[in-house]
Amino acid sequence: MFWYKIIPLDVLLFRDAKPFSPGERAWAGSVFPPNGHAIAGALRQLIGDKITCQIKGPFFCYNQETLYFPRPLGFVNSNPLIPLVWQQKNSLNYAFWDRQQPCPLLSVKNSDNSAQESFQFRQFLPYNVIIKYLETGKISAEDWAIQEEGEDQPWAVETRSHNALLESTRQVKDADGYFVENAIRLKSNWSLAIGIDREIETPTTIRLGGEGHRAILQRCDNLSAQWETLAKLSNQNFQIGGKSLAYLITPGVFERLHDNYQSICQSWPWEWKLAHITNSNQKSGQLVSVASDRAVPISCRMQYENRSIPAPQVFAAPSGSIYYLNQPQKLFQESDEATKQAKRWRQLGYSELLWISFEVETGFL
């Protein structure tokens, strides 16, 4: 796997996944960081029209040498959230809860969280903190404190006005010819980072996002070493087995065809069945609970009559989601039985998981 930095030359435009027409909505929203489809589109000019390589990311990179990942959502401030059923001595185990849904999560006070309200919390965590998280299952209170500018949000939003032009002309439309759009500017010393299983001669430029804005693609071997260390530790935790946490570091697309061939998305993999059952005819699985947030809409494109047209929206679980399992379980997207379409999501970098072993000795309980 070869790792690269993406350094924007100016602002970037990533229009949100909602249908947009200046006549209906004079304000075009923006979504950032870009999804795997946007990255694949930028790479097409370098590696060919048909993307067959494996993509990791995108993530953030600080000062050209450190990977940053979205904060795990299994915390309230610095206090970890633990499934109720994993806290056998808690009196709330006598309470009723809907067993057709994931188990409720309870906040467990961190032993070193004194004065935690006196600082701002990181929304993106550096490589060294994630390594400790994978090794111990804990993130100390001081590791949540912002130490570098941009760790709360590595980008700024700039509002730009646009004039819509008449087709095949350079004249502004008389009606609905003006709208406003949000542009993204990365803060100083920040860049995007991606991994690709293909070597590309760098430095080179790519078109990224809307309106042909350009960015520099630069090889960075430091990031390769960091990713290999994380992947090795994650695989070791997966092999250990037992109670585990799956940490989602890129948007997770978990969709399944239902009646009338309608695809439905949810915030955890469909193949991960709940560990608790409501009747004896059900087969229990390994999934105990989920810590997640609002779904992320993803707008793709598809071929229709030799034309590229907008595809139906897909809703992904947000980066940082945490899944609590009694035993680690692989994704269907990574299995040999997976369809070509299912494997495509992983190929584009979606649904990337890091595994953490959960032990009582870590101090959670």
PLM features: residue spans?
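Conserved active-site/ligand-binding neighborhood in enzyme cores
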Residues: 2-365
